[in-house]
Amino acid sequence: MPNIQNGKTGKWIKSEEELPAFPECVFDHLPSFLNEVVNNSISLDDRDTILIGAIVCLSVCFHNICGVYDERIVYPNLYLFVVADAGMGKGALTLCRELVAPINRNLHELSKRLEQEYKEAMNAYIKGKKDGGMTIPTEPPMRMLVIPANSSASSFLKILGDNDGIGLLFKSEGDTLSQTLKSDYGNYSDVLRKAFHHELVSLSRRKDREYCEVSNPRVSVALAGTPEQVRKLIPDAENGLMSRFCFYIIRFKRGIRNVFATNDISQSKNAMFKLLGDKFCHLHEEFVRQGNYSFSLPSDLQEHFIEYLSR
């Protein structure tokens, strides 16, 4: 956070005026799809927010890619919190959800079909129960990609388990998640901390004789909120979530942009991102069909990484 001193190290975090935007060289080398995405931005802060938001939302879809970091297998998943005062443009993050909406919708439709088949099978089982020889049908998994941020802890783990440990927590108001984590039924902060490192997560409730376990979770998180909402979610630096989140802070600016730039619904940001979501859905289907991938940095970039972070 800007203008907040780290009392233990004595170092000052950069002031809000010093916070940089992503350099132009980043945008000069984007993949073609991401280039289409950021071309819908209306300012530098908007472009940065859309880029990092898109990367985080798409990261949950690349569960077939892994690499080795610090001698451990890692996946592309990231945790993001876009921080800004009210009315400063953090709402651009909501557009990024449209990029994965078709995939989420397809999974919901699959769940409905499986649920209907299950009900029909159960009816047949009940009618033929007296005859014997019939096996009780198994309840189908609840398939989805985007997990509601107000889910209870057991529901969160159940949904993860139903989806092979894959899920995106997306909320444009970060206090929804912080309120959920503070409640008795929804405190899965520990699950999020472990899921970041793809560690086995589990939950046991004695009252309901309930036990949930998910191995190799691959969870991405995209949140937006005000500085106060960050403090509610992560009260201090000792909280383990602090080191797991990427924070992008939108600087305070006076004035108003032209909110009447277009009157054409087909040219609205909503319409453009829905088209991009449909395009990504097709790209994703083809990508997953190709199989699994492993990623590693070239040795010269590994050396540059170590050298840079050793300064």
Regions found by a protein language model. Name each.
Residues M1-R311:
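Phosphate-handling catalytic cores of nucleic-acid transaction enzymes
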